[in-house]
A protein has these predicted regions:
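A conserved hydrophobic helix/loop-capping motif in glycosyltransferases and polysaccharide synthases
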Residues: 6-18, 22, 29, 39-41
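Conserved donor NDP-sugar-binding/catalytic core segment of glycosyltransferases
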Residues: 100-129
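Cell-envelope/extracellular polymer assembly enzymes that use nucleotide-activated donors
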Residues: 4-7, 25, 35, 178
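Short aromatic/hydrophobic "clamp" motif used to bind/position activated sugar donors
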Residues: 88
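Acidic donor-binding segment of Leloir-type glycosyltransferases
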Residues: 23-66
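Glycine-rich, basic loop-to-helix element that forms the pyrophosphate-binding segment
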Residues: 65-83
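The conserved acidic donor/metal-binding loop of glycosyltransferases
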Residues: 92-96
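Conserved nucleotide-sugar donor-binding catalytic segment
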Residues: 139-221
Length: 284
């Protein structure tokens, strides 16, 4: 297992145009000891797609799920089973890394098992909508992690010798948080990079923002709450359960109120809707 290489996992489902930006963002990293693992989940030959754009590199690896729409969790697990490097990073095919992300993550991984990053939330034209989790670098516990990183979590990097897991293929949403919950069985903290080093693209057709997302989110969050109540995760930090349950309960309340809030304020981001509720809880 390589002690320096960071393997970047990119599941690919109908992203022939968008994936170019994702792969180019890894190519532009100041830290060059990386691999990219593209997992086709739509029978597309992404090696050919990227090659047509001049993206040919021995550090690129390609796998296929053998299905159409098996899901990002299936694709990521396929890569996790194949990768031999110690460090793994997650990158959705419609997102990008800022050039210094892997260097900052690698430096932090010398002392910490998991690294997260502030997000630069963007529209489909790569215009900034807002930042999430920006500020100083800080050490987060499982109990308070989601009160800082209140949006998506598919920007983490982790050390597989200190914590590892596979994605839960039974969940439609919240799979990144659920993976973290597994990692927290042995990892007590997350080192959060306060500089927004990860571009998170908001697309209407994505699993996080598309039609029916509220219903899927509610089901997945409810499932995670049930697991917490049953002691499913046996966290290394005993305080994790209470903090995560608080976040999920607040998030479920936000889901219930979001349709009315969106009707009053068209275009309202869920993050902008949720954040004041989290702050009120933290201040109570």
């Amino acid at each position: 297992m390589s002690d320096t290489t960071i393997a970047v996992i990119i599941p690919a489902y109908r992203v022939e145009e968008l994936i170019l930006e994702a792969v180019r963002s890894v190519h532009a990293q100041t830290y060059t000891d990386w691999q990219i693992w593209v997992i086709s989940d739509d029978a597309t030959d992404y090696e050919r797609v990227l090659g047509r754009q001049g993206l040919v590199d021995s550090r690129l690896h390609f796998l296929e799920t053998g299905a159409i729409g098996a899901g990002a969790s299936v694709a990521r697990n396929l890569a996790l089973d194949a990768i031999e490097s110690r460090y793994v990073a997650i990158l959705d095919a419609d997102d990008r890394m800022k050039p210094g992300k892997l260097a900052a993550a690698h430096s932090a991984l010398a002392e910490h098992p998991i690294v997260s990053s502030a997000l630069d939330v963007m529209d489909t034209d790569y215009r900034r909508l807002r930042l999430v989790g920006a500020g100083p670098d800080r050490l987060l516990t499982p109990a308070n992690y989601k009160f800082t990183s209140l949006s998506m979590d598919s920007m983490i990097v982790w050390d597989r010798t200190r914590c590892d897991a596979r994605y839960d293929t039974s969940l439609t949403n919240m799979t990144d948080l659920e993976l973290l919950m597994q990692l927290w069985r042995t990892a007590k903290t997350v080192h959060h990079l306060g500089e927004p080093l990860h571009d998170y693209l908001k697309r209407e057709s994505s699993m996080s923002n598309g039609e029916g997302v509220t219903e899927r989110m509610v089901r997945s969050k409810t499932t995670l709450l049930q697991r917490l109540s049953q002691g499913h995760y046996a966290f290394a930090d005993p305080a994790a359960t209470e903090g995560l349950a608080s976040f999920l309960n607040i998030s479920l309340a936000a889901e219930a109120a979001y349709p009315d809030a969106l009707a009053r304020m068209p275009g309202l981001l869920f993050e902008d809707h949720l954040e004041p509720m989290l702050r009120a809880h933290a201040a109570a």
